[in-house]
A protein has these predicted regions:
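Conserved SAM-binding loop of SAM-dependent methyltransferases across substrates and taxa
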Residues: 95-105
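Conserved SAM-binding motif I beta-strand of class I
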Residues: 107-112
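N-terminal juxtadomain amphipathic helix
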Residues: 1-63
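A conserved beta-strand element that flanks and buttresses the S-adenosyl-L-methionine
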Residues: 142-145
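Conserved SAM/SAH-binding beta-strand->alpha-helix loop
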Residues: 114-116
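Conserved class I S-adenosyl-L-methionine
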Residues: 83-94
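A short, conserved alpha-helix within the catalytic core of class I
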Residues: 152-155
Length: 155
């Protein structure tokens, strides 16, 4: 059942440098009238329209976010015995800020379709510029993190 329509809205987090028009998408809330009662967006924006070279977020520019990511790594390491050479994976790794908090003797891997512009931050880490899927990371990791990413996944 329709609840609220805000019409077509510009996609957030996208900063066009060339003055071109930012893509827009419908922003309509609907309510499941079945047993679930879920309030959700009616439409999903293709992930390639949001994440890529024009995605503008950078984890490292916000001190609160840097502190939070440091805490996430501290908590993960307190639960898992990380040994030299163990693989740690950050899905949606952005500029590599979270991975910077692991010791340099860990094999630090970031996967992010928007991270090509941050390649310099990954000199001592592995970067896979793509969306996460089994085919581009068939290995096992000792610790896997993903911050503020799952709400962008449709299924």
């Amino acid at each position: 059942m329709p609840v609220l329509s805000l019409g077509n809205q510009a996609l957030t987090g996208i900063f066009q440098k060339d003055g071109s028009t930012v893509k827009r998408a419908p922003l309509d809330l609907v309510l499941c009238m079945g047993s679930c009662g879920l309030l959700q967006l009616r439409d999903a924006v293709p992930r390639t329209d949001v994440f890529g070279p024009t995605y503008g977020y950078e984890s490292s520019i916000n001190a609160t976010m840097r502190d939070h990511l440091r805490h996430v790594v501290h908590e993960a390491r307190s639960r898992v015995g990380l040994q030299r050479g163990d693989v740690v994976l950050d899905i949606g790794s952005n500029d590599g800020t979270l991975l910077d908090n692991y010791p340099s003797d860990a094999r630090r891997v970031g996967i992010d379709p928007s991270a090509a512009r941050f390649e310099d931050n990954y000199r001592d880490k592995e970067l896979i510029v793509d969306f996460f899927r089994r085919q581009n990371f068939p290995r096992k990791a000792k610790i896997i993190t993903s911050i503020a990413m799952f709400y962008d996944v449709e299924d």
